Design a protein with these regions (language model features):
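Short S/T/G/P-rich N-terminal loop/turn motif that feeds into the first structured element of a domain
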Residues: 1-89
Length: 89
């Protein structure tokens, strides 16, 4: 299962981190397991999520046009587009 990393900005890093459990469920629903949250150490609002993607193409499709419940979760967590997606090769 290839590793996948998604980076993006957030409105507030601490608020984003407070939703860790909820985000893990939402990310798992898109096909990413063992998700790990990462926050930039430079004080910026840049974050990343890393995990194992069973079907990277399906995950990328889900993120390109997220279902309403995923979009609502992203908004509640303060996600700021664009999302950059990296896949282990």
């Amino acid at each position: 299962m290839p590793k996948m990393v998604v980076t993006h900005g957030v409105v507030d890093v601490e608020k984003w981190l407070s939703f860790k459990a909820e985000r893990a469920e939402a990310v798992a629903a898109t096909g990413v397991l063992n998700a790990v949250d990462l926050a930039a150490q430079d004080g910026s609002n840049a974050v990343a999520i890393m995990g194992d993607a069973d079907d990277p193409a399906a995950v990328m499709a889900a993120l390109a046009s997220p279902p309403p419940e995923v979009a609502a979760t992203m908004e509640r967590h303060g996600v700021v587009p664009p999302l950059m997606i990296y896949i282990e090769k």
